[in-house]
């Protein structure tokens, strides 16, 4: 038999989370962000569940081609734009909208020969200091683009650095508003955190929001708020089985480095999942896990192919018992990926995207 581990992608949860994005910004359009292999879920698996979105946003031309091959004829936005001049040919052929964040991309457009003008999203660096034109240079970039026959419509966009935290978005909004006040074009500002926390403000939600991590059942501002607060549902479950048990005496240690020591007699279970499956290697003892739908904890260091869990209070647990590393147990109990990631010192995005190729993935169309 195959190794007892699998990941499930819950289609109904994806559809529910997209509906939550729409509810937060009822008069704006929603990009479903499917970059990074749809946050580890797989574009082909999430497409049908998310096709009610107004458009799909991603980074990779191959992923854009995949969406067209799946039958999507609506807008596709390249969030980082093109990486070399010849990419513009594929943008023309696939009818892709693309971000412009630097002078080189404008130069390439000026040299591009096309009969189909491009729809571009001009990006401002409003304080994130990754991609985008600084406010003082933004208007000149817009003027250059506006003069090009290769460019049709110019939308204006930025990305908040602190929409999920206490610093908030007021300063970035002021920078953006000051630099774009009399420029025409649609606006796109909100990521998931801004959509949920600030979407009630018409100026913030603007014309397009970019819903990413919220679609996949992770709270963008965890631990300030969890998925229950935002009415989001887990879309990925990582599930394995117990493949063995051990009875420990007080003083016995567990795993590499003897990081866990039993303080009293206890029983532990060995789970067919490790960091080679995408489980966070730095998850410490105490990280939550579900065994037969009951919450318990990790004990000892995460190994390549195994983790060990506390079976105290679980007398029925035995070889073959279901272990939910994150997501939804067969019993209906839920362990949000955010809790696991937080215990491991990271965020929910990372274990989603780190799901290993060796883990079989199954689409749960009914869940």
UniProtKB/Swiss-Prot annotation:
Alphabetized GO MF terms: alanine racemase activity; pyridoxal phosphate binding
Classification of source organism: Bacteria, Pseudomonadati, Pseudomonadota, Betaproteobacteria, Burkholderiales
Name of the encoding gene: alr
EC number: 5.1.1.1
GO annotation, cellular component aspect: cytosol
Source species: Methylibium petroleiphilum (strain ATCC BAA-1232 / LMG 22953 / PM1)
Modified residues (N6-(pyridoxal phosphate)lysine): 35
Signal peptide region: none
Keywords attached to this entry: Isomerase, Pyridoxal phosphate
Cofactor or coenzyme needed: pyridoxal 5'-phosphate
PANTHER family per record: ALANINE RACEMASE, ALANINE RACEMASE, CATABOLIC-RELATED
Protein family (similarity comment): Belongs to the alanine racemase family.
Catalytic activity: L-alanine = D-alanine
Pathway(s) the chain acts in: Amino-acid biosynthesis; D-alanine biosynthesis; D-alanine from L-alanine: step 1/1
Functional description taken from the UniProt entry: Catalyzes the interconversion of L-alanine and D-alanine. May also act on other amino acids.
SMART domains xref list: Ala_racemase_C
SUPFAM superfamilies: Alanine racemase C-terminal domain-like, PLP-binding barrel
Domain of life per record: Bacteria
GO biological process: D-alanine biosynthetic process
Active-site positions on this chain: 35, 256
Official protein name in the record: Alanine racemase
Binding site for substrate: 130, 304
């Amino acid at each position: 038999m195959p190794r007892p581990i699998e990941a499930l992608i819950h289609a109904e949860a994806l559809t529910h989370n997209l509906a939550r994005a729409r509810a937060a910004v009822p008069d704006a359009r929603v990009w479903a962000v499917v970059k990074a292999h749809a946050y580890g879920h797989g574009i082909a698996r999430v497409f049908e569940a998310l096709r009610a979105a107004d458009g799909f946003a991603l980074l990779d031309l191959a992923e854009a081609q995949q969406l067209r091959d799946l039958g999507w004829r609506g807008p596709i936005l390249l969030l980082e734009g093109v990486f070399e001049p010849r990419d513009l040919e594929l943008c023309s052929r696939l009818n892709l909208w693309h971000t412009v964040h630097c002078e080189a991309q404008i130069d390439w457009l000026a040299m591009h020969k096309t009969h189909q003008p491009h729809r571009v999203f001009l990006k401002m660096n409003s304080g994130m200091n990754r991609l985008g034109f600084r406010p003082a240079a933004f208007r000149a970039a817009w003027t250059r683009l506006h003069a090009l026959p290769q460019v049709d419509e110019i939308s204006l966009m930025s990305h908040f650095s602190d929409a999920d935290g206490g610093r908030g978005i007021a300063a970035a909004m002021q920078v953006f508003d000051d630099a774009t006040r009399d420029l025409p074009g649609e606006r796109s500002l909100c990521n998931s955190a801004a959509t949920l926390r600030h979407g009630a403000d018409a100026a913030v939600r603007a014309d397009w929001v970019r819903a990413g991590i919220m679609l996949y059942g992770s709270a963008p501002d965890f631990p300030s708020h969890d998925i229950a607060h935002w009415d989001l549902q887990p879309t990925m479950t990582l599930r394995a089985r117990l493949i063995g048990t051990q009875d420990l005496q007080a003083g016995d240690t567990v795993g590499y480095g003897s990081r866990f020591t039993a303080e009293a007699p206890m029983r532990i279970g060995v789970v067919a999942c490790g960091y080679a499956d995408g489980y966070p290697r730095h998850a410490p003892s105490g990280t939550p896990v579900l065994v037969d739908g009951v919450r318990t904890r990790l004990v000892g260091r995460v190994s390549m192919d195994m983790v060990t869990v506390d079976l105290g209070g679980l007398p029925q647990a035995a070889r073959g018992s279901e272990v939910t590393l994150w997501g939804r147990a067969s019993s209906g109990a839920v362990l949000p990926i955010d809790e696991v990631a937080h215990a491991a010192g990271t965020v929910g995005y990372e274990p989603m995207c780190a799901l290993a190729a060796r883990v079989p993935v199954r689409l749960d169309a009914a869940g």
